[in-house]
From Swiss-Prot:
InterPro entries reported in the protein's UniProt record: Peptidase_M14
Gene3D superfamilies given in the database record: Zn peptidases
Keyword Zinc-finger: no
Record organism: Leptosphaeria maculans (strain JN3 / isolate v23.1.3 / race Av1-4-5-6-7-8) (Blackleg fungus)
Binding site for substrate: 281-284, 339, 356-357, 414-415
Ranges of Low complexity composition bias in the record: 23-53
The protein's name: Inactive metallocarboxypeptidase ECM14
Propeptide: 22-186
PANTHER family to which the protein is assigned, alphabetical: INACTIVE METALLOCARBOXYPEPTIDASE ECM14, PROTEASE FAMILY M14 CARBOXYPEPTIDASE A,B
SMART domains cross-referenced by the UniProt entry: Zn_pept
Predominant location category: other
Co-factor: note: Binds 1 zinc ion per subunit.
Entry cofactors: Zn(2+)
UniProt record, GO biological process: cell wall organization; proteolysis
Length: 573
């Protein structure tokens, strides 16, 4: 890989000293945020609106944007002329060339609508038999990508009732163009593709504005130095950490954001921490960009926004933009639609393990079949996926050795606009804190929908969000693919993270994993509203803390095994 230029590295190295010489708004943090204003309204949208459209950007903001533009202009890897990024950024035209057509031109994405158990079972078996790429599925439909010349074979395995129950979502030139457009273009202006429209995607006024880092999807070679920059520029409340090492030897970087108490006379309680993760599935780029947007928004708002400042004083937030760095790099260099990690399997020509099927809780890779060529291959044993085990080991070490208590998990994925709570492995077993999970989930969905005119997200269990139902009584139809061994269930059940959610971001299928880059900021904005609502909920400003808890949940055993007073005796208004 070509390395960053000396000038760029020098800029990164001197950035902290340059920033130190710039007057910061956060210098007044210790006095201005220690006491919350009497007029503070935790439910007010304006309370966390940090935008000031008529105010010139501060010097540190201009400096950070200049550095980020420099990072973003660095050359990327193009070994053996196989880099997909080089193909996207090389030509001045925004039309895909022959290489793109040869790679994806024969594919089609079809949406099947199932009504009966026989139809669901037949589609599930056919997808497994033909090694098809199942993009998404829920109670209404299943989206499957396949080569067009495989379609006759697929229909031959399906009942006749399904022969007329599918429709193409993307095919031929449209699919190739959608893939091509997700890569950045060195020649395109920020307003590129302003006329793109989908019935499920409202045109956004934000696509040509805002931070330059979020005008495009970014490769890992840009994300990593950007994270280092954030840590260097905001030393009071940001620290870059390493979750672990991937199979191919890459770091799994994260940003820990929070302000720790300085009073050493009082015993230090376990630091309540919220995990916000993305990228378990490599091709879900919007999840990675959204985590970066959330981190940037929270980091920049500290000392300026009362609500976010208060949250960072009470909680740590750990932002992990990609838990699957090897797979993510592969989507930039070779195959945009790659899903799994990149470790070898028992079949030399079939690489990768589905990291979100590799966790040990209710792992069922042996029951679902062990086919390394499957997109949802769970490995031959629990934790065979290297990155899954590294993530779990890090989290356990945090709780056992570093005085951390994980109180929330938001694991971002795409697509289908759903907020999913445990369990994923079963539609029949109920989590002990079901009512609290449902209540908070509905609150998150409402915060997304109303605060910034966001989209509608469905709230349900992860199992019910990933199966089809035969009727209104929810007779569960056969699964399209396994949902055992998920990160969601593992963190909820094994690490006792009470508020654990998997959130599937925009859209509902018109673009699927190929969400236009113009939707990065709008998606980030609506998720920021969800994160702020989560914070209010955990602080007791909305939801469960206004009345007595109804759940059967038992807290992690940290000596006494009890909740603290605010949690154990909820306030009734």
């Amino acid at each position: 890989m070509r390395q960053p230029t000396f000038a760029a590295l020098s800029l990164l190295l001197v950035a902290p000293s340059l920033v130190a010489a710039v007057p910061h708004d956060s210098t007044s943090t210790s006095t201005s945020t220690s006491t919350r204003s009497p007029s503070y309204d935790p439910d007010s949208t304006a309370a966390h609106d940090t935008t000031t459209p008529h105010t010139p950007p501060s010097p540190w903001r201009r400096l950070s944007e200049a550095i980020i533009r420099r990072i973003g202009s660095l050359p990327h890897e193009n070994h053996l002329q196989k880099s997909m990024l080089a193909l996207a950024t090389g030509p001045s035209s925004r039309a895909p060339g022959k290489q793109w057509v040869a790679h994806y031109g024969g594919d089609v994405v079809l949406r099947f609508k199932m009504q009966t158990a026989d139809e669901a079972r037949a589609l599930s078996q056919a997808a497994a038999t033909l090694f098809l790429d199942v993009w998404e599925f829920n109670e209404d439909w299943a989206d499957i990508r396949l080569a067009k010349d495989v379609l006759p074979s697929l229909l031959g395995l399906l009942p006749r009732s399904l022969h007329a129950s599918y429709e193409p979502l993307m095919q031929d030139a449209a699919l190739v163009q959608a893939i091509f457009d997700t890569y950045p273009s060195s020649s395109a202006s920020p307003s590129h593709n302003t006329n793109r429209f989908s019935p499920n995607l409202r045109p956004s006024p934000h696509h040509a504005n805002g931070h330059p880092f979020f005008q495009d999807y970014q490769p890992l070679s840009v994300i990593d130095p950007w994270m280092s920059l954030m840590s260097s520029m905001f030393t009071t409340h940001v620290r870059k950490i390493n979750i672990g090492i991937s199979y191919e030897g890459r770091d799994i970087p994260a940003l820990r954001v929070g302000v720790h108490p300085t009073n050493k006379d009082e015993p230090t309680k376990p630091r309540k921490t919220v995990l916000i993760t993305a990228g378990l599935h490599a091709r879900e780029w919007i999840s990675t960009s959204t985590v970066n947007y959330l981190a940037w928004s929270v980091i920049n708002a500290y000392g300026k926004d009362r609500e976010i400042t208060h949250l960072l004083e009470k909680f740590d937030f750990v932002f992990v933009p990609t838990l699957n760095p090897d797979g993510y790099v592969y989507t930039w260099e070779t195959d945009r639609l790659w899903r799994k990690n990149r470790q070898p399997t028992s079949l030399r020509f079939c690489h990768g393990i589905d990291l979100d099927r590799s966790f040990p809780y209710q792992w069922n890779g042996d029951q679902m079949g062990s086919n390394p060529c499957s997109e949802s291959f769970a490995g031959d044993a629990p934790f065979e996926g290297v990155e899954s085990q590294r993530f779990a080991d890090w989290a356990r070490n945090e709780t056992e050795s570093n005085n951390v208590e994980f109180v929330g998990l938001l694991d971002l994925h795409s697509y289908s606009q759903q907020i999913l709570y445990p369990y994923s492995y079963s539609c029949h077993d109920e989590p002990p804190s079901l009512e609290d999970l449902e209540e908070l989930g509905l609150g998150l969905a409402k915060a997304i929908r109303i605060s910034r005119k966001g989209h509608t997200y469905k709230v349900t269990s992860a199992c019910e969000g990933n199966v089809a139902f035969a009727n209104k009584e929810k007779t569960v139809l056969p699964r399209i693919e396994s949902s055992g061994g998920s990160a969601l269930d593992f963190f909820y059940h094994e690490l006792r993270v009470k508020y654990s959610y998997q959130i599937k971001l925009r859209d509902t299928g018109n673009y699927g994993f190929l969400l236009p880059k113009e939707e990065i900021i709008p998606t980030g904005e609506e998720m920021l509203d969800a994160v702020l609502y989560l914070g209010r909920f955990m602080l007791g400003e909305v939801g469960w803390a206004r009345r007595r808890s109804r759940s059967r949940w038992s807290a992690p055993d940290r000596g006494t095994g009890d909740f603290d007073e605010a949690e154990q005796v909820a306030i009734e208004l």
